[in-house]
Amino acid sequence: MVAFTPEEVRNLMGKPSNVRNMSVIAHVDHGKSTLTDSLVQKAGIISAAKAGDARFMDTRADEQERGVTIKSTAISLFAEMTDDDMKDMKEPADGTDFLVNLIDSPGHVDFSSEVTAALRVTDGALVVVDTIEGVCVQTETVLRQALGERIRPVVVVNKVDRALLELQISQEELYQNFARVVESVNVVISTYYDKVLGDCQVFPDKGTVAFASGLHGWAFTVRQFANRYAKKFGIDRNKMMQRLWGENYFNPKTKKWSKSATDANGNSNQRAFNMFILDPIYRIFDAVMNSRKDEVFTLLSKLEVTIKPDEKELEGKALLKVVMRKFLPAADALMEMIVLHLPSPKTAQQYRAETLYEGPMDDECAVGIRNCDANAPLMIYVSKMVPTSDRGRFYAFGRVFSGTVRSGLKVRIQGPNYVPGKKDDLFIKAIQRTVLMMGSRIEPIEDCPAGNIIGLVGVDQFLVKSGTLTTSEVAHNMKVMKFSVSPVVQVAVEVKNGNDLPKLVEGLKRLSKSDPCVLCTTSESGEHIVAGAGELHLEICLKDLQEDHAGIPLKISPPVVSYRESVSEPSSMTALSKSPNKHNRIFMTAEPMSEELSVAIETGHVNPRDDFKVRARIMADEFGWDVTDARKIWCFGPDTTGANVVVDQTKAVAYLNEIKDSVVAAFAWASKEGPMFEENLRSCRFNILDVVLHADAIHRGGGQIIPTARRVVYASTLLASPIIQEPVFLVEIQVSENAMGGIYSVLNKKRGHVFSEEQRVGTPLYNIKAYLPVNESFGFTGELRQATAGQAFPQLVFDHWSPMSGDPLDPTSKPGQIVCEARKRKGLKENVPDYTEYYDRL
């Protein structure tokens, strides 16, 4: 069945147990888009000849040029299973037709926020791993993201053709290679074991691992071969599957199975995987590549594969492609694995509801989500915005978790800051149209029931990046997505021609809509600042801004890194500030927090929204806090979730609760703009020791308390030997031995240091991991390629904040220079103010 109509899609959408929502995730350049091609080609959207190099899902021109996926794209495919396959289904299904909603996501680490957006709306993931390179840093990151969202993985070991043609390794070596890759994936999976999700490990003999060559368009699972042999020898398929992987050997002479490589008489047995699966493949490769055509055709007739007369004329790799594609079509193997081993929305939403929904688990929305019920109140999570062909408008791309969405329906559009019962961040508007996403095209569709992925027209003006759409008045939001990267590289953008300013402002709004991880801000001096996850991410964002969103020439400053201000020891004396009317006093000290706790707050392990008793317990047990202190945390900052806290250590202060709001507001302000150069504070703990307040309420209003609290935060920070923290990238480089020297010289020049290097077993490649300050990372990729003659490919991921040595208050030191430059750029006074500016005498 080739081109299927929206009506047929609509029919399948109504059977949630026959829908599969899945994303394709992997390390950069392991072949996601190429593999996706085979699946798309099965659905008849591109021709078989093009599959493997069309990269249909890379819809943008710059994606085709660079050969790297930038945005995640969705497409709906149709799969038919045979009755025989249906017997192995883990869950009940309705008929043999399946709808697979597939999202191809980028692998490059700068775009991992796109991956997060894709994972949120899917229930299963196809993890692609390169046979030769194995599990890399980004494979691990995306797997961790997937398991954190409770998404079930299946694995494809890709690029098998490279192992056969380039490395020419023996069958046993190839088996060992596969076994190693599968094992290292399982190690990552078992690290993030989740009781509710159960065991997610993958095994070739269970059918959850496929071996493929995306470029040549062929793939197989152990199950497919077991099927073949089960028919031939008349034995049970599932028994055969277990025999075809692991330590199972077969002796062709005696026709006996054994568990060891040699039998009692010393005859050697052959590993079943090598003999029954790899042998036919090796033979075909051998015969085709050494152009022994007659041998090829006898092999094909034995394997019951027929090819067309005109295809018999082909030579070399072209013939190999055709033969392997006919023998082991990639789409069949992958579709079978997706349908049999990934959960349907009906199953998945039962265990994902609690990680998706913020409200109580027994209100009507939560129940609707859990049952994936098309008649419940509508709940849609919009995970990102997709630009339309019509300039400046966006489709909202998301998933219906419960209810049914149709054109013209009035919905409540809740942004990420919406609180039930309040009116902030809430719009009530009608949806203009609902559409199906098909790669670069869209198909209009009447309505869309729970469990499906959908595009909406007409809500883009009311949402920035993501949000919840619902028809229920009591609905809470769906949880906000946690991104694994943070925007640390910023540039200032100006227009060349003053009249274009409104266009720039409008363009920045659109840019921040279209990319989940970009941050556009306006500083107090009126600069427009764009922040991104890394050099490549920023480059693409600015290109989009100039060409699509704003459409005007821009002046772009050299990139600037964002720093954090922190303290290195407790305040040398207690800081005191008096209010402007001299009637109120606040006493405070600052001290550093442990790095572990700061990271725990940033990753959400210690959460400001948790119950304070639970949180206090965690902080006391894991981070050695005093329980009473941990219970009396007033707030986190900046943005109520940052890694700084205010602790109330006062004893018996009258009217204290009345000023709590003012202090929290002041702290939010102070922690966003630190005293040294107006960067965010990080990992500081502020203790309020004592507060003296005026008895008369009119003399202790917000106007008196807020400036005072802010000054006392600044004073206590400057008294606690302040330091600055710079962001550090984790660099992973894969390189052959002869280019190692070049890497070390480039890293040493840029203040980087290598902390691990290991050789990949069975290959001449080394894996090098190093830390590199973000400040030094500009142009790093280019220099590295020069030094290693283009052999090394670095992956840079933001890893942690590291304190810089040197006193930032001394203008001659390195941190001091950074502070001075930043102050000049922001239009502040040259020198850092002394603590006495904020400190009042008793």
From Swiss-Prot:
Keywords: Cytoplasm, Elongation factor, GTP-binding, Nucleotide-binding, Phosphoprotein, Protein biosynthesis. GO terms for cellular component: cytoplasm; cytosol; ribonucleoprotein complex. InterPro entries: EFG_II, EFG_III/V, EFG_V-like, EFTu-like_2, G_TR_CS, P-loop_NTPase, Ribosomal_Su5_D2-typ_SF, Ribsml_uS5_D2-typ_fold_subgr. Residues 17-253 form the tr-type G domain. It is found in: Cytoplasm. The modification Phosphoserine is found at residue 568. GTP binds at residues 26-33, 104-108, 158-161. GO terms for biological process: cytoplasmic translational elongation; translational elongation. The modification Diphthamide is found at residue 699. Its main location: cytoplasm. GO terms for molecular function: GTP binding; GTPase activity; ribosome binding; translation elongation factor activity. SMART domains: EFG_C, EFG_IV. The modification Phosphothreonine is found at residue 574. PROSITE patterns: G_TR_1, G_TR_2. NCBIfam families: small_GTP. Catalyzes the GTP-dependent ribosomal translocation step during translation elongation. During this step, the ribosome changes from the pre-translocational (PRE) to the post-translocational (POST) state as the newly formed A-site-bound peptidyl-tRNA and P-site-bound deacylated tRNA move to the P and E sites, respectively. Catalyzes the coordinated movement of the two tRNA molecules, the mRNA and conformational changes in the ribosome. Belongs to the TRAFAC class translation factor GTPase superfamily. Classic translation factor GTPase family. EF-G/EF-2 subfamily. This is Elongation factor 2. The gene is eft201.
